[in-house]
Amino acid sequence: LVIRRQRQMCIRDSSGAVWSGPMAFDEAHVKPTDIKYASIYDSFTITVLMQLEDLGFCEKGKGGAFVSDGNLIAGTGKLPFNTDGGGLCNNHPANRGGLTKVIEAVRQLRGEAHPNVQVQNCDLALAHGTGGSLGTRHGSATVIMERE
């Protein structure tokens, strides 16, 4: 678990994932391509694109193409993503969105997600959340979990 405290930044540059993500990958001794499932806080569509880029799942500036190419679709994409519907479709519980990210990641690792979206052989998952005011002052946390 890596938590990065608030820091001044410009929304044109990056999200807090640019700090918490690399630290989490280093501590877990894995890289973004090893992740089988990602549960990422999605308060707005731009938030998702920025965090996918800053976590290293795609190149900076290529988040839109990464998503539109179908990479986030469970069963067919390179990085199944927010299979619970995410905050934009299912579970935006005000300031408690981070925990829902961990819950769905654990369901995937245990093989307990809905059968239509269960990621086959999911043994490594990432949960990431950002809070505060994206683009000015915010904090982020990245958790990488492995099935035993």
Annotate the PLM regions.
Residues 1-11:
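Single conserved hydrophobic/aromatic residue that forms the stacking wall/gate
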Residues 34-54:
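Conserved beta-ketoacyl condensing-enzyme motif
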Residues 72-75:
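Membrane-interfacial loop-to-helix junctions in multi-pass transporters
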Residues 47-51, 82-148:
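Conserved beta-strand-centric core segments of catalytic alpha/beta enzyme folds
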Residues 14-28, 104-111:
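Short, well-ordered amphipathic alpha-helical segments that serve as non-catalytic structural scaffolds
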Residues 14, 38, 92-95:
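Hydrophobic alpha-helical scaffolding
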Residues 5, 32-40, 61-69, 79-82, ...:
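Beta-strand segments within the central parallel beta-sheet cores of soluble alpha/beta enzyme folds
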